Amino acid sequence: MFLPQEFIRRKRDGQPLDRDGMAAFVRGVTDGSVTEGQVAAFAMAVYFNDLSTDERVALTLAQRDSGDVLDWRALDLDGPVIDKHSTGGVGDVVSLMLGPMVAACGGYVPMISGRGLGHTGGTLDKLSAIPGYDVMPATDAFRRTVREVGVAIIGQTARLAPADKRIYAIRDVTATVESVAMITASILSKKLAAGLDGLVMDVKVGSGAFMPTAEKSAELARSIVDVGNGAGMKTTAILTDMNQSLAPCAGNALEVACAIDYLTGKSRPARLHDVTMALSAELLVTGGLARDVGHAREKLQQALDSGAAAERFARMVVALGGPADLLDAPARHLARAVVIVPVPAPASGVVQRVDCRALGLAVVALGGGRTRAEDAIDVSVGLSALAEIGQRVEAGEPLGFVHARDEATAAHAADAIRRGYVLGDTGEAPPTLYQRVD
C-alpha cells in the first residue's frame, strides 16, 4: 500500500525516490487522495533536498501521464512534431513568427501556450488581440489545423497534465515556486503531453527574466535539456538576453502588429530577428529538417522572403476563427489605445541599463496584464518605440511611447519608464544570444 507520508519522509531525509513511488504520488495528486498539505510538504522537501536527474524525469513523466497525451502518429504527418518554449519575458513575440516559419520549412508545430504571468506577457493574451481567434478550440479543430496548416497556437486544456496545475497552485502559495527541479517538471510535462518529437527551450537571462540570476537561468537550461532528453524528447536550449524588451514594443495588439510587420517584411528589428532565427534554426536542426544551423537559416530566410511563413500565419488565423485579411489590413482589426503619449528623456545620454521587469509591470498596470487570474485585459494598451541599450537619446526625445486607456494610467506608466531607464555617457548593448545547451 502506498503511503504518501512515507514517500515524503524519504525526500525529507534525503533518500532517493523511485519511479513507481513518484507515479503513485502524482496519481494521488490527480485523484485527490494526496492532500494539499502533503503536496506542500513534498514541494518543500524537494526545495531543500532537490531531485536527481532520474527523479526529475520520473516526476515529469508522472505529471505528463496524469492526463491526456496527444498522439500525432495517426495523422501520418510527413515531418517532425516540434516546438519552442520560452521562460517568458517582455516583448517576447517570437512564437508568433517561429511557428509559421518552421511550418513553412516542413515542421509541424502544435504550440500549447499560456497567459501572462507576473511581469511577463503571454502568447495567448497576444492572440486574444485578434478578433475571432479561438485560443481554446476543440481537439479535433486543433489537430486539423496542425495537419493542414502546419502550426496551431492554442491554450492548455484542463486535460493536459492536470497534476501539474494542482501542484503549481500549491507551490505558488508555499514559497516553493523557485525549485529548478519542479519548474523543469512543470514545463516539460506539458510539452511531453503535447506529443512532441523535439523541443528547443528559450531560457531568458537578465532584468526581465523569470530566473533571478544568470547562474540560475543556466541551471534551469541544463536541467530542462537533461530531463527532456531523459524522457525521450530531443531537447536543446539557448540562453537569450532579457535585459530589455525583446521587441521594440510590449503589449498585446502592439506585439501582434510587430509580428505581422516581421512576417511581411515591413520591419524586422535586429534583436528580435536574431533570437527568432536562432531558435527557429535550432528547431529545424533538432527536427532533422536541416543539416546544420547555416542550412536552417537559409531555409528560414527563404520562407520569409517568399511570403510562405506569412501565408502560414494567415492560414492559422483563419483556421482558428480570425479575419482573412488580418495581414493585409491589421489596423482594421487590432485595437488601438485611446491615449498615446511620448515619454521624453529627462536628459541627454546613452541608455546604459533598463529595468526590464519594471517595463513589464508598467504594461500590467496599464491593463495589458493580470494581477489576478480572473482579471480581464485590455489588448490595446502597452509601450512602443522603446529605446535600446547603447542607443543615444537627446533630452526631450522619447524613450518610448505609452498606449493607454486614459491620461492617468498613461502618466503612471510614463513615470515607470523614466525610472526604468538609466542614461550615462557611454553604454554598450548586451549580447542577444549567450549560450547553447545540449
Swiss-Prot record:
Give GO terms for biological process. Answer: pyrimidine nucleobase metabolic process; thymidine metabolic process
Q: Which Gene3D superfamilies match?
A: Nucleoside phosphorylase/phosphoribosyltransferase catalytic domain (3.40.1030.10), Pyrimidine nucleoside phosphorylase-like, C-terminal domain (3.90.1170.30), Transferase, Pyrimidine Nucleoside Phosphorylase, Chain C (1.20.970.10)
User: Which keywords fit this entry according to its UniProt record?
Assistant: Glycosyltransferase, Transferase
- EC number(s) per UniProt? 2.4.2.4
Q: Which GO terms describe its cellular component?
A: cytosol
User: What domain of life?
Assistant: Bacteria
State the pathway, as annotated in the record.
Answer: Pyrimidine metabolism; dTMP biosynthesis via salvage pathway; dTMP from thymine: step 1/2
Describe the function of this protein: The enzymes which catalyze the reversible phosphorolysis of pyrimidine nucleosides are involved in the degradation of these compounds and in their utilization as carbon and energy sources, or in the rescue of pyrimidine bases for nucleotide synthesis.
The subunit field of the Swiss-Prot or TrEMBL record says: Homodimer.
State what protein this is by name.
Answer: Thymidine phosphorylase
